[in-house]
Regions:
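Hydrophobic membrane-insertion alpha-helices, especially the h-region
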Residues: 5-20
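Acidic, polar loop-rich interaction surfaces within structured domains
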Residues: 282-285, 293, 300-304, 309-379, ...
Length: 512
């Protein structure tokens, strides 16, 4: 009976496809139907036909281009959450360290912050049940929940003899797009780090700019590095904030009429006129490339860093009958000067995501275009920065350091121990004073010997030569973790900026 039903459904699908597409794909559909029937008849064990068909749909869409995709119902819920900019829960950033949920930082203005959770706190029980070595899925199920509902957690805190219980009332938790914003006081240069383009991104940016302007900001750096994109509307509205004339921001070209659109600037209520730098790298994609490409083409910002990823395909998300969705590419993005953002993908998906091939395809396919004032810019995929600043080999080696990549997060743990030892000294400092102390030299007497002794005492494997080679970067990461624990993400990003060549270059451009 099961097989008969399936054959009837297959015939109906086949008939529909023939009506829609004509008879030319008939042999392909026959072949698919034959493979399905043979698999059901001959496969050595039972299998879920729905799972198999989902795999077939995924494969079909992946064959079209790297960004058309099938999204399951469960995946779609998570993706929608990211774009909507909120979820319901207790509000912590965490890692599972030594088997326990360890608080990296409480999210500001959430139940966890209001209850006084601290970086380094270990959640050992949830609602009376052990939380030791539970899966991420279980963590989500137990800590997230309806706004107003209650969850009890037992906390083990460094310095406390006994664990203690906290009752939290779940609430709406914002997923921030702007994750850091601060000002370099002496130069009056503002810095804003944006990590996604969601429903509330422009609103968050506007609030950050208002706060920075009230502190005397005169110039601005927007950091879009490793920002993989998001909503087109937010990218367009962000560019519009910094334009005072009617200009094309981005346009799209596709096969169907509705896919051909031009997005223009309007008379913005913001109309920000200060000098700007946009920072990008090869993790900057889609909406990030629309923003950086438009502001570069319209001579509104200087672009610093590395060329961007080159994702310039427009997807339309279409809901399917079971709550899943298909994202189908309907058009390509072009910057105001006519540059196609999408880089070639005819060598296959594996090659498309290979970092070395990204450089090769973009370098090979360079084309010349001109900004509004006549300055030369390059197309062929991705956005080319005005100042190409690559990290040196020393920093690239640090990124691969075994201690830095260790899932036990030794740098975070060591920083937490140093913070506890020096708590009375740190409590007397402001955020700005802390930054000044670090800039002067070896604050808190951090040294390699102490760190290595700590690694040994905690049975953490390391390579001595790597520690010696990378100590400058490790030291600033320790300072950044201490700062994050005391004052939040702003000081963390500011401290890491002390070894960030791309940020240093951006500051120097705006100072000149």
């Amino acid at each position: 009976m099961r097989k008969t039903k399936f054959i009837i459904v297959s015939i109906l699908i086949l008939g529909f496809c023939m009506i829609q597409f004509g008879a030319s794909p008939l042999s392909a559909f026959k072949k698919l139907n034959q493979v399905i029937s043979l698999s059901q008849e001959l496969y050595f064990e039972e299998f879920d036909i729905n799972d198999a068909m989902e795999g077939a749909i995924k494969g079909f869409l992946e064959e079209l281009d790297p960004h058309s995709q099938y999204i399951s119902k469960k995946e779609l819920e998570s993706i929608n959450e990211q774009f909507e900019g909120e979820f319901e829960g207790i509000g912590i950033e965490y890692s599972v360290l030594d088997g326990y949920i360890t608080v990296i930082s409480p999210i500001p203005e959430t139940p966890s912050e209001r209850a006084g959770l601290q970086p380094g706190d270990k959640i050992i029980k949830i609602n009376g049940e052990s939380a030791y070595k539970i899966s991420n899925d279980e963590i989500f199920k137990k800590l997230r929940g309806r706004k107003g509902s209650e969850v009890k957690i037992h906390i083990l805190r460094v310095g406390e003899v006994e664990p203690f219980e906290i009752t939290l009332i779940r609430d709406k938790i914002p997923i921030k797009s702007v994750i850091a914003s601060f000002i370099f006081d002496e130069s009056k240069i503002g810095y804003v780090k944006i990590n996604r383009f969601a429903n509330n991104t422009v609103q968050e940016l506007a609030q950050s700019l208002f706060d920075l302007e009230s502190q005397g900001m005169q110039k601005l750096i927007i950091d879009l590095r490793n920002n993989g994109g998001g909503l087109l509307s937010q990218a367009v509205n962000m560019v519009d904030m910094f334009l005072s004339s009617n200009d094309t921001i981005v346009y799209t070209k596709g096969k169907i009429r509705s896919a051909n659109e031009v997005y223009y600037s309007s008379k913005s209520i913001y109309d920000k006129t200060y000098e700007m730098v946009i920072m990008i790298n090869n993790g900057s994609a889609s909406a990030s490339e629309i923003v950086s490409g438009a502001l570069q083409d319209l001579d509104r910002a200087t672009i610093v860093g590395e060329r961007s990823f080159g994702k310039g395909l427009v997807q339309r998300q279409i809901p399917l009958m079971d709550g899943s969705a298909a994202r189908i590419t309907i058009a390509q993005y072009f910057t105001p000067s006519g540059r196609l953002i999408q880089r070639p993908y005819d060598e296959g998906i594996g090659n498309y995501y290979d970092e070395s091939s990204i450089e090769d395809t973009i370098t090979t396919n360079k084309s010349i275009h001109y900004t509004k004032s006549g300055k030369t810019v390059y197309g062929g995929g991705g956005i080319w920065p005005d100042f190409n600043i690559s990290y040196d080999e020393n920093f690239n080696q640090f990124l691969k350091n075994k201690v830095r990549l260790n899932t036990k997060r030794p740098i975070f743990k060591f920083a937490n121990d140093i913070k506890i030892i020096n708590e009375s000294k740190l409590n007397k400092l402001t955020e700005e004073k802390y930054y000044q102390e670090i800039s002067k030299g070896n604050f808190l007497n951090l040294n390699q010997t102490k760190f290595i002794e700590w690694l040994d005492s905690n049975n953490i494997k390391y390579n001595y030569e790597e520690i010696k080679r990378d100590w400058r970067y490790i030291k600033y990461d320790i300072y950044a973790e201490i700062g994050n624990s005391m004052w939040g993400k702003n000081i963390s990003y500011k401290v890491r900026g002390l070894y960030d060549k791309q940020l240093i270059k951006s500051i120097n451009i705006l100072k000149d």
